[in-house]
Amino acid sequence: MPVSPLLLKFAALLSLGALTACGPQGLESPINSPYVSGAESQNVLYTAFTQRSPKFLDPAKSYSTDETPYTYNIYEPLYGYHYLKRPYVLTPRTAVAVSEPSFVDQAGNALPADALAKDIAESIYDIKLRPGILYQPHPVFARQADGRFSYWPLEDQALKDKFVIGDFKQTGTRELTAFDYVYALRRLASPRVASPIFSTLADHIVGMQAYGKRLREIDTALRKDLPPGSRDLPWLDLREAGFSGVEALDEHTLRIRVKGLYPQFKYWLAMTFVAPIPWEADRFYSQPGMAQRNLSLNYWPVGTGPYMLAESLQNRRHVLVRNPNFRGEPYPCEGEPQDRAAGLLADCGKRTPFIDKIVFNIEKESIPLQGKFMQGYYDIPQVDRGDAGVAMLVAAGDSAAKATLYAKHGIQLPTTVEAQMQYFGFNWKDPVVGMGDTPERQVRNRKLRQALSIAFNWEEYVAI
């Protein structure tokens, strides 16, 4: 099922009544409610964030857990993960299917699917997109009756009263195409973006490294006569020059060429780094004056996902609302053996999303957050962190009174498996375990590092 796990988490919580935050419909709001009268009867999920607002909502830059409730519900990568199946299973989102690569040798000759890694020069991914997927209503697509864009080009005076994306009253949409993914992958190489994964993907995608170098040269030329630190930069149009490793074969077919055999590559395609970017959005936000007003993909994303950002008050409040152009995806009908008994398949086949609006309010202190959650002002303390749930599980285990209180409030504390990776590094400049300044020391130090790695008891470390 091409459904966002986080979206389905919201859906499951709401449909199961896992956390009862709102009072029965028809009752008046309590006098100390932080919400407007009648809000408790609306189809809204209330939650909180405890640190700053998300720093990056641009999918090429976003690499932090606290940004994922926004990015994975606004943008759509090619793939996602099945909400209920464990171990995790890739599923298509905007793609028709999870595509298997074809292989060629150095001469470009086709190889069988079971070819040896040493014989494979390239892995070629041809990915078909689902037709008819539309972007959210957004000013970047707005056009006048004669077909000209409503908000490009804009004169300086046109921005004097524009501070949030809602100040642009006209909106439009268009269909998602394979070129939007091509544009997104090209942006990863742009020096204007400084994506944290460019160097990693450039090692694997054919031609990406050289393309990044060429973009740096073009960007340097565009900045030549500008003062240092200028925020208003000429648009770096990525439609004009590309690289052979990524191309659109037609409107709905994307081809990616990967060096050698790299079976893990498909998992990158489930991350928002490869979420589509319409060139219209890149051009719209590059106009003079936009950066000074924080009008950019970092603050106002443009996507095809189930939700869109309707309100954004930095370090105060963010609101996601249902994307009216979202096609709707069926809730899964299969999962783990215990899921049916737990009621997690009760909504089988129903169209998602189930929730009309998601409201994030800042709560800097944990005790007030916990208190408001227990009073019903929040459905979930934090959607991106499980700390509160872990603390409540411990409290319920230690105190029968707490367990009774949670049961009285109808609070459920389901657990799931989360994949994590931890590692320890060696100081490369250390004379004993580092690189070593002679060939002999390099060999000795490497063997010592390997011995330490073998001797380290990971099982005991995890248990502690």
Give residue spans per PLM region.
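C-terminal motif of bacterial Sec signal peptides marking the signal peptidase cleavage site
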Residues: 18-21
